[in-house]
Structures are given as C-alpha cells and as structure tokens.
C-alpha cells in the first residue's frame, strides 16, 4: 500500500519524478490540461510552478509513494475568493499506470479530504473527464453537480 505525505517544497529529483508521473498519465489519455506528447521540459516547468506556490500556502501537494518512490499525487487549491473561504478545489489527481488498481487514488483522495477538513474546508470541488476517475469519486461519496 502506498504511503501519502504532504510536500512543503520540491527537490529537483521530486520535480523530475512528478514530471514522469504526469507524462505517463498524459500518455495514458488522462485529461489533465496537457496534450500528448508532453515534453519532459514542459512537465518539469509545470511542477516548478507548483513548487513556487507551495511556500505561500495557496496550494497543498500530496504524494503517494511505494517502495520505488512517488507513484501518485493530488493537489488542493486553497486560495479562493473571499466569499468562499469554506471551499478548496481538488486538482491534478495523478496515478502512474504501474500503480493503478492498487488503491492509490482512493488513498490520495482520503488524505486530501482529511487535509481539507483540517483546514476548515467544507466544500471540495473537482472536474474530471475520466469514467475511471468518476467511479473513484462516486465510491468515495462525491456527488455529481453537473456536466459541462
């Protein structure tokens, strides 16, 4: 079972590993704001941007690790308009294809929900285009609010 932890900063090695997870997910057809083929440079630039936001507390980054290293990640976007302090957005739920069907996504989701509760968030919002991901969220009790 993968272990989940929150990262407050990213090392260059972690950025490279997360870039690999992102590239794998995009290659596998994930709808996560990037098109295939995704270059390693572009993937690393994305994670560097995430790393730059972590110290400010506007974004929380969780990673799932197995004996080989990082196999999944999810983010909570915590900065919301002043009339929505109760809300956070769940973003970039990524699980490497080699680690799927092992409970990594469910473990990441539960950890993100717990972190949100600890931060006083009572509403979590996400979007997904994946039937597999939609089933994961439904099993965890999430409700569909609309289709775009």
Predicted regions and their residues:
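Acetyl-CoA-dependent GNAT
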Residues: 5-92, 96, 109-111, 115
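Active-site acidic-Proline motif in GNAT/NAT acetyltransferases
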Residues: 96-98, 102
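Conserved beta-strand-loop-alpha-helix junction that forms the acyl-donor binding cleft
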Residues: 100, 124-135
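Residues forming the Rossmann-fold NAD(P)(H) cofactor-binding site
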Residues: 102, 106, 110
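Short glycine-rich hinge loops at helix-strand junctions in the catalytic core
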Residues: 103, 120, 141
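Conserved GNAT acetyl-CoA-binding A-motif
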Residues: 109, 116-129
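Conserved catalytic-core motifs of GNAT/GCN5-like acyltransferases
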Residues: 125-127, 138, 143-148
């Amino acid at each position: 079972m993968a272990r989940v932890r929150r990262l407050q900063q990213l090392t260059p090695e972690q950025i490279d590993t997360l870039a690999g997870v992102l590239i794998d997910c995009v290659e596998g057809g994930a709808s996560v704001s990037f098109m295939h083929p995704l270059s390693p440079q572009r993937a690393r630039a994305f994670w560097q941007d995430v790393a730059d936001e972590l110290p400010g507390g506007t974004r929380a980054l969780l990673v799932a690790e197995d004996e080989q290293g990082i196999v999944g990640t999810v983010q909570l976007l915590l900065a919301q308009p002043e009339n929505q302090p109760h809300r956070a957005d769940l973003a970039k739920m990524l699980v490497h294809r080699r680690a799927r069907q092992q409970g990594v996504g469910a473990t990441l989701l539960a950890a993100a929900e717990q972190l949100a509760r600890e931060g006083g968030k009572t509403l979590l919002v996400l979007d997904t285009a994946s039937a597999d991901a939609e089933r994961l969220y439904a099993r965890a009790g999430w409700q569909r609010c609309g289709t775009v």
